[in-house]
């Protein structure tokens, strides 16, 4: 859930696809989610993951009143914590506290929450809030987050998690 206006998310998806060689697309309402595909939440609306039936996931895209920010990382994390068996949350640079409530849902289910090291952020509000919530399993630099995701996704197994202690 990249906080970005709707005019910019298609180009952002194209840029990421070109830069990474991955299958990166902008999501849309009702889209079937496929393994190995990276989906960018469209700007100005919220994206949630639903599980219409066993082993099938779809994107529910609409604006919700629950959040002042669209797309909302909290709503995305909360829905994926309910719908998925082994989701991984990642909180990167950004202002405000979006993502910290969803991270708490992950922590309650013992799902991993990776957070960008605040010292490496352009704006450390979102990572700082997630850390302060006590719901974070690892605080890493972006390159370390990428390596961890590749390792976990390549292994196709649920990562073992443990909350880090915060002061």
Annotated model-derived regions:
Residues 1-167:
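Conserved acid/base catalytic micro-environments in cytosolic active-site loops
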